[in-house]
Amino acid sequence: RLAEPDRYTREEALINGPRHVPVEMGEADEGLRFEGGHDAYLSSHGLTHARRLELTSDGRSRTGEDMLLAIEGAEKRRFDKVLSATQLKGVPFDIRFHLHPDVDATVDLGGAAISMALKSGEIWVFRHDGTHNLSLEAGVYLEGTRLKPRSAQQIVLTGYAMNYATRVRWSLSK
């Protein structure tokens, strides 16, 4: 979230951002692994966001897992309070994957996947574990050499956190 503009410089500082951003990289069974997270939603929702990515050695497949976690007692109490405010419908969240403007993406397999055609002719497919809603939405691409943003698309996984641990698994493969 941005603060009110400074009265002299008109700059807007980022506030309420993450304070703790752990990152770890290493080897996975079939390639490389990245694990990271942040606590930006801790004070507002009691949730820590963690992400695990694995990339196969041949570069043809990437799997991911996003997690929203209420870990300690105070965090669980904060999450319970936010969950109660939703009348137990769940805390809404979106996971967004922004695509380059040159990627031609379409919803495929009856809404279970997104197929992406690259200019090179390669086809990549995004799939998820089926526990949340998958959609394709309009987005923008900011390019340093252009004065205006370019139209693009973004893959969006939408869901509701109902428990102290919410997991969303997805993959991107050729």
List the predicted regions and their residue ranges.
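CBM-like, beta-strand-rich accessory domains located in the C-terminal region of large
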Residues: 1-174
